[in-house]
Amino acid sequence: MPPKDSDSSTASGPRSKTTRPRAIRRLVIWYRRNAAVTSLVGSATNSASAAGNVAGTVVSSAGSVVSNAGSMAGSMLQPLVFDPLRRLQSSENNPEAEDIKNSDRLWVAVDGMGGDEAPGPILDGCLKAIQRLPLRIKFVGETEKVLGAVQAMGLTELFNQATAAGHLELVASGPSVGMDEEATVVRRKRDASINLTMDLVKKGEALAMYSAGNSGAMMASAIFRLGRLAGIDRPAIGALFPTKDPTQPVLVLDVGANMDCKPIYLHQFALLGNIYSRDVLQVARPRIGLLNIGEEECKGNDLAIRTHELLSEEHRLQFAGNCEGRDVLSGAFDVVVCDGFTGNVLLKFLESVGSVLLDVLRAELPRGRRGKVGSAFLRSNLKRIKKRLDHAEHGGALLLGVNGICVIGHGSSKALSVVSALRLAHSAASHGVMDDLAELQKAPVESA
């Protein structure tokens, strides 16, 4: 260590003798350690660089091989996997993506004047159905009102395209039957839209018909114009109810056509429902249930007890016994028969379940931030629940027992309900349900 310079020491001010040497020693130690670490890092870096060059060469060669193999595999697999996947995704996002052949389209007659707000929503639903389903539609209605609805709802372009393509045909009719008019008015208004719609089915110009109008007038017109099937005393209205299994609904009939029934009527309803469930819903052996207040054979009123005896002796169907109200939506039955009064009450009750359930859930969810977060997580689930319970998703009910496929819609039907109802009509027509229904013979027991 060099001797301390007195002049410099004086100039720099007083300083401790032990402080300066200790600081220098620490600096030297730090420098030596740093130099050693730097040397090690440098050699390691050089080695890593050399190894990286070698590995880079290998990886580059392997990468080119993998790239070439990937290109070959992609060219081979892409037409088999990715293209169909893209087509599937595009068709899901856009139902109109897949072209429908004209040869596959079936004629369906639509009562354009039937409904609370007809003809606007009915026409809107028909135009949407033409784009999504293999259908041609004969739209029966008062010409001026129909064309006015086209302008008012902004459907001019779609209407012109459908008519030009031959997918939509406007059939002029006279004054329609009002929603509040008596059913017998169809005898006086011979050129009403509901009567002309039935005539199209009777003449064979349409395979099915749909109306959201006066249900009593529709049933009367169907009986007068089409006639009842052989062996059927009273037609019945059959509606599809959701069950625990979203893919397998239950058919409930009658839901409003016959307020007072005899045992033989319910027996015939079971035969009609059995054929419809088998042909259209594709149930191999439909399980038939009789709506009652208990499972035991002795339960219920005189109508239920006598009907139970008839169904137990019927070999043309699989009778699964009495069905309590709690079992209707359980999935234990494929067809449930009842009188029209009870069935209509059950139908109207079910229509309210979806909205009431959502209202209860909204009321029970906590308010504030916790409620908003919980609602955000549950929103998609609640929408799916509402969709399964929404009567608009099922569209309509079938009038079974007449010589033609007739679908009855709700008076307040919107476009979605119309599309669903027309899908139901197309399904019944394409499965040839009328051929099997026409083969029904008179029920063996007539004294009941």
Curated annotation (Swiss-Prot):
<dbReference type="Pfam" id="PF02504">
    <property type="entry name" value="FA_synthesis"/>
</dbReference>
<keyword id="KW-1208">Phospholipid metabolism</keyword>
<dbReference type="GO" id="GO:0043811">
    <property type="term" value="F:phosphate:acyl-[acyl carrier protein] acyltransferase activity"/>
</dbReference>
<keyword id="KW-0444">Lipid biosynthesis</keyword>
<comment type="subunit">
    <text>Homodimer. Probably interacts with PlsY.</text>
</comment>
<keyword id="KW-0808">Transferase</keyword>
<keyword id="KW-0963">Cytoplasm</keyword>
<keyword id="KW-0443">Lipid metabolism</keyword>
<protein>
    <recommendedName>
        <fullName>Phosphate acyltransferase</fullName>
        <ecNumber>2.3.1.274</ecNumber>
    </recommendedName>
</protein>
<dbReference type="GO" id="GO:0005737">
    <property type="term" value="C:cytoplasm"/>
</dbReference>
<dbReference type="GO" id="GO:0006633">
    <property type="term" value="P:fatty acid biosynthetic process"/>
</dbReference>
<comment type="similarity">
    <text>Belongs to the PlsX family.</text>
</comment>
<feature type="region of interest" description="Unknown">
    <location>
        <begin position="1"/>
        <end position="105"/>
    </location>
</feature>
<keyword id="KW-0594">Phospholipid biosynthesis</keyword>
<dbReference type="InterPro" id="IPR012281">
    <property type="entry name" value="Phospholipid_synth_PlsX-like"/>
</dbReference>
<dbReference type="InterPro" id="IPR003664">
    <property type="entry name" value="FA_synthesis"/>
</dbReference>
<comment type="pathway">
    <text>Lipid metabolism; phospholipid metabolism.</text>
</comment>
<feature type="region of interest" description="Phosphate acyltransferase">
    <location>
        <begin position="106"/>
        <end position="448"/>
    </location>
</feature>
<comment type="function">
    <text>Catalyzes the reversible formation of acyl-phosphate (acyl-PO(4)) from acyl-[acyl-carrier-protein] (acyl-ACP). This enzyme utilizes acyl-ACP as fatty acyl donor, but not acyl-CoA.</text>
</comment>
<dbReference type="GO" id="GO:0008654">
    <property type="term" value="P:phospholipid biosynthetic process"/>
</dbReference>
